[in-house]
């Protein structure tokens, strides 16, 4: 994930300040050097790195910590505020009728991003349409059509036409009933003159309200030239950063934002059309520093529960809070969790679980956990309806039968039953809570996630410092 190494190394440096009430010059120097090393290794431009580190150093040595605030929390607040300022605000994309033009080199992820953005707008109650104008890349039309089918959004393209400007013009007309028009353009392997000429012609034809540059998170220092060329041609209003689910450094996105004086609009976090986030600087930096992002978490939970319920009309998640908790309910919870995205991303959003705790886990911990969930699903396939409804009926002989039938071992079957008991106990605790109890519990979670900071608000999109 973008700047992930920065988050890990910063948390390590900040943890060394635990118990200190005041900072000395050596403390500040170590933190500033760590920031410089991490940002430079993430391909952030040198001038940006020096500007940020200088600002943090000046504030850390010149500002007095508020009464009752530890040295660690004082520096954490400064680093948080300066990093939010570095990444900038999110691109202004009002939820109303507009045309969005996508630009970028071949392989940057434009076509996938077009479908993902269209899906995102559709979840906000709008009617988006994707217009595919790429006549250069073989398979571009088919890929766009398939992605839009998965996103369940309107699509226009013409595989028999080799004039991208004509396709763009006719696409706008053919999808006139759409609220949002997302125009996907061709890319090249390099910034060639014909690419710039083509996108300038499309820009003149569709007159976009917003032009977004799509960048692969692995782009590195090459982002600066790309951003400058496209900005000179059509004017870039924002950046879409793709492929953040891998090991990409991501610093090139910050360089592009600085070069175009724009901002980040969306983050692509996975391969499916739902793996997209509207960029929220406060929540993003909060996650980076291990303080969670409850706003993004709640959006993912709500979406995952709705999709799970839609797939099974007979299941209602609210029933869990009123009746018994069966293995069927546990299975639905697992399905919803799977729909929330990769487990490591979800952990980053939970105050107290992301950040430092995740850093201590083995590298393969998330994969092992998700594989175990798949094992549990296979085991439940080998259980009878009565066993799924009443796990207490599963004795030793049934455990052996289920293990043989599922191709797993008895230990894993018992682990599933034990996991169910733990979840059942947790559900019962929630069942006895009123709304006020729930809010107090969430507030406590947020405070724990921020290292005990008295001023922690933890609102996700508003940032952890209110």
UniProtKB/Swiss-Prot annotation:
Residues 446-466 are annotated as: Disordered. It catalyses: GTP + H2O = GDP + phosphate + H(+). Keywords: Cytoplasm, GTP-binding, Hydrolase, Nucleotide-binding, Ribonucleoprotein, RNA-binding, Signal recognition particle. The gene is srp54. GTP binds at residues 104-111, 184-188, 242-245. Its EC number is 3.6.5.4. GO terms for biological process: SRP-dependent cotranslational protein targeting to membrane. SMART domains: AAA (SM00382), SRP54 (SM00962), SRP54_N (SM00963). Transmembrane segments: none annotated. It is found in: Cytoplasm. This is Signal recognition particle 54 kDa protein. Part of the signal recognition particle protein translocation system, which is composed of SRP and FtsY. Archaeal SRP consists of a 7S RNA molecule of 300 nucleotides and two protein subunits: SRP54 and SRP19. Involved in targeting and insertion of nascent membrane proteins into the cytoplasmic membrane. Binds to the hydrophobic signal sequence of the ribosome-nascent chain (RNC) as it emerges from the ribosomes. The SRP-RNC complex is then targeted to the cytoplasmic membrane where it interacts with the SRP receptor FtsY. Residues 448-466 have a biased composition (Gly residues). GO terms for cellular component: signal recognition particle. Belongs to the GTP-binding SRP family. SRP54 subfamily. The keyword Membrane does not apply. One of its GO terms (molecular function) is ATP hydrolysis activity.
């Amino acid at each position: 994930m973008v700047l992930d190494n920065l988050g890990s190394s910063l948390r390590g440096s900040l943890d060394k300040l635990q118990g200190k009430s005041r900072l000395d010059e050596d403390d500040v120097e170590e933190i500033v050097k760590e920031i410089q090393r991490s940002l430079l290794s993430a391909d952030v431009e040198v001038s940006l790195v020096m500007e940020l580190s200088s600002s943090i150093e000046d504030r850390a040595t010149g500002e007095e910590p508020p009464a009752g605030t530890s040295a660690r929390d004082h520096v954490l607040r400064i680093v948080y505020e300066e990093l939010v300022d570095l990444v900038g605000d999110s691109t202004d994309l009002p939820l109303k009728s507009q045309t969005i033009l996508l630009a970028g080199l071949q392989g940057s992820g434009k076509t996938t991003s077009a479908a993902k953005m269209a899906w995102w707008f559709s979840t906000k109650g709008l009617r988006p349409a994707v217009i595919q104008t790429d006549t250069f890349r073989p398979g571009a039309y088919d890929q766009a059509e398939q992605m839009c089918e998965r996103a369940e959004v309107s699509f226009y393209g013409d595989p028999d036409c080799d004039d991208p400007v004509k396709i763009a013009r006719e696409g706008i007309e053919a999808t006139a009933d759409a609220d949002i028009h997302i125009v996907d353009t061709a890319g090249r392997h390099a910034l060639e003159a014909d690419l710039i000429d083509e996108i300038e012609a499309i820009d003149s034809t569709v007159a976009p309200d917003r032009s977004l540059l799509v960048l692969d998170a692995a782009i590195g220092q090459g982002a600066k030239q790309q951003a400058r060329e496209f900005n000179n041609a059509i004017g870039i209003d924002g950046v879409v950063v793709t492929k953040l689910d891998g090991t990409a450094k991501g610093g090139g996105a910050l360089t592009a934002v600085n070069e175009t004086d724009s901002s980040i609009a969306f983050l692509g976090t996975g391969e499916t059309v739902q793996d997209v986030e509207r960029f929220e600087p406060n929540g993003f930096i909060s996650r980076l520093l291990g303080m969670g992002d409850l706003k993004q978490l709640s959006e993912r939970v709500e979406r995952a529960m709705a999709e799970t319920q839609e797939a099974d009309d007979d299941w209602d998640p609210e029933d869990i809070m009123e009746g018994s908790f069966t293995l069927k309910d546990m299975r639905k919870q697992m399905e919803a969790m799977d729909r929330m995205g990769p487990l490591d991303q979800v952990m980053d959003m939970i105050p107290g679980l992301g950040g430092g705790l995740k850093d201590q886990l083995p590298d393969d911990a998330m994969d092992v956990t998700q594989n175990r969930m798949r094992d549990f699903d296979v085991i439940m396939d080998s259980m009878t309806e009565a066993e799924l409804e009443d796990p207490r009926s599963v004795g030793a002989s049934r455990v052996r039968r289920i293990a043989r039938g599922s191709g797993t071992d008895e230990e894993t079957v018992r682990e599933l039953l034990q996991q169910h008991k733990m979840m059942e106990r947790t559900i019962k605790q929630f069942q006895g809570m009123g709304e006020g109890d729930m809010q107090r519990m969430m507030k406590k979670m947020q405070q724990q996630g921020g290292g005990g900071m008295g001023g922690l608000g933890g609102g996700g999109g508003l940032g952890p410092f209110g």
